[in-house]
């Protein structure tokens, strides 16, 4: 049988499969998918986040094979992974550092969307699906942080689950349901482990929907103008796949540095102490990617008020397409918005710093000012800038 016959047979098999399950057509669509020709390296962040998600799922599944979700054995099983499982230390550090790298990519991805107006029509649903992914990521990361069953894991779970008790009438039953009893204990750990395993696969489904929404109207671009002809676009492959690999290289260099040289830099030393319900840590601190929201939570003395503000800080992102009244997408052509954007970024970083500090003065008072500006940016600054700002002239073509 010569090569031509073999090639025809293999093509026939591919066509037979593709007719019934169009996998190959779908992959071909990605190859020929037309993308704006002026995308910069900030558009790599979506692909980087996708790679980070795959790494988390692979390492998480392998770690789950060796983890014991029981309050008497969870801490020891993690230490056993570190010492007795082949390359267990690498798996654990890759998973722990990978969570931080995933959030870093997502935060930059969101910041890029805010600056370039990627939430504006016709991409509102694309933005909303992205925020839902972010919410589920936060829930997944929180439950994952509980699993090592160290001091910070236990007390972090106690503090955060207790927040639901602030809800009038139904708060206490919700907390008891979350705990599976009257305190954080074995049922809590078991259900957190089950949900932590499940949620990444829900994220995968949402990522697919995110991509479907993206391909419906195409990517936004740094100029924030619509594509008018095929001259404004280039195929995603090979042009942007090659560009993505450059971003992957930078990402993996930073990733490798933390894994091999500073694996615990982003963690907390108290989590290397087994959970003890009788001893409260001097300072309960969440992971760095929750610190801005933690600062918002602690900014007011009322528990219900803090919970309301913390969840409101994320809900306001859903309303963003309608709060920003400007018709111009890109911050490059909005001089006043550009200043407001960088002030907002500084405010978010400052909230992260304040979230890492003890609940004492002057941090509480400063936090209130920072939280006030956070909400003013969305509810006051954006609507007013959209009405009164004089944007720069938009270019005609990409």
From Swiss-Prot:
Entry note: cofactor: Binds 2 heme b groups non-covalently.
Cofactors (names): heme b
Residues binding heme b b562, per UniProt: 95, 196
A molecular function (GO) term: ubiquinol-cytochrome-c reductase activity
Pfam families: Cytochrom_B_C, Cytochrome_B
Highest taxon of source: Bacteria
Main location: membrane
UniProt: heme b b566 binding residues: 109, 210
Entry's localization field: Cell membrane
Sequence intervals crossing the membrane: 45-65, 96-116, 129-149, 164-184, 192-212, 245-265, 277-297, 304-324, 339-359, 366-386
UniProt GO BP: respiratory electron transport chain
Keywords: Cell membrane, Electron transport, Heme, Iron, Membrane, Metal-binding, Respiratory chain, Transmembrane, Transmembrane helix, Transport
Membrane topology: Multi-pass membrane protein
InterPro entries, per database record: Cyt_b/b6_C, Cyt_b/b6_C_sf, Cyt_b/b6_N, Cytb/b6-like_sf, Cytochrome_b, Cytochrome_b_C_euk/bac, Cytochrome_b_N_euk/bac, Di-haem_cyt_TM
GO cellular component: plasma membrane; respiratory chain complex III
Subunit structure, interactors included: The main subunits of complex b-c1 are: cytochrome b, cytochrome c1 and the Rieske protein.
Function: Component of the ubiquinol-cytochrome c reductase complex (complex III or cytochrome b-c1 complex), which is a respiratory chain that generates an electrochemical potential coupled to ATP synthesis.
Family: Belongs to the cytochrome b family.
Miscellaneous field: Heme 1 (or BL or b562) is low-potential and absorbs at about 562 nm, and heme 2 (or BH or b566) is high-potential and absorbs at about 566 nm.
The protein's name in its UniProt record: Cytochrome b
Gene: petB
């Amino acid at each position: 049988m010569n090569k031509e016959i073999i090639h025809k047979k293999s093509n026939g098999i591919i066509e037979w499969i593709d007719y019934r399950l169009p996998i190959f057509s779908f992959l071909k669509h990605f190859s020929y998918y037309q993308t704006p020709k002026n995308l910069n390296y900030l558009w790599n962040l979506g692909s980087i986040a996708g790679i980070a998600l795959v790494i988390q799922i692979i390492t998480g599944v392998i770690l789950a094979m060796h983890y014991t979700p029981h309050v008497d054995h969870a801490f020891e099983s993690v230490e056993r992974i570190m010492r007795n499982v082949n390359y267990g230390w690498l798996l654990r550090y890759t998973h722990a550092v990978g969570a931080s790298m995933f959030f870093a990519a997502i935060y930059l991805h969101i910041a890029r969307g805010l600056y370039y107006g990627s939430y504006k029509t016709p991409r509102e649903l694309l933005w909303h699906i992205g925020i839902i992914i972010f919410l589920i990521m936060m829930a997944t990361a929180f439950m994952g942080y509980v699993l090592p069953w160290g001091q910070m894991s236990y007390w972090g779970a106690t503090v955060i689950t207790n927040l639901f008790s602030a809800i009038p009438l139904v708060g206490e039953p919700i907390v008891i349901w979350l705990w599976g009893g009257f305190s954080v204990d074995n049922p809590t750990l078991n259900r957190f482990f089950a949900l932590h395993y499940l949620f990444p696969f829900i994220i995968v489904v949402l990522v697919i929907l995110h991509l479907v929404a993206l391909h419906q109207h195409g990517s936004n671009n740094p100029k924030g103008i619509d594509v008018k002809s095929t001259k404004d676009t280039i195929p995603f492959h090979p042009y942007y796949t090659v560009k993505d690999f450059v971003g992957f290289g930078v990402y993996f260099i930073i990733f490798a540095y933390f894994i091999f040289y500073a694996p615990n830099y982003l963690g907390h030393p108290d989590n290397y102490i087994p959970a003890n319900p009788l001893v409260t840590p001097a300072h309960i601190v969440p992971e760095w990617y929750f610190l801005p929201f933690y600062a918002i939570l602690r900014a007011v003395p009322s528990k219900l008020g803090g919970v309301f503000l913390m969840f409101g800080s994320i809900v306001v992102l859903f309303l963003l397409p309608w709060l920003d009244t400007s018709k111009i997408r890109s911050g490059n052509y909005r001089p006043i918005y550009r200043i407001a954007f960088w002030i907002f970024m500084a405010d978010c970083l400052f909230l992260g710093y304040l979230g890492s500090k003890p609940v004492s003065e002057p941090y509480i008072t400063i936090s209130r000012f920072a939280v006030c500006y956070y909400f003013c940016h969305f509810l006051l600054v954006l609507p007013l800038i959209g009405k009164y700002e004089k944007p720069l002239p938009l270019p005609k073509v990409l």
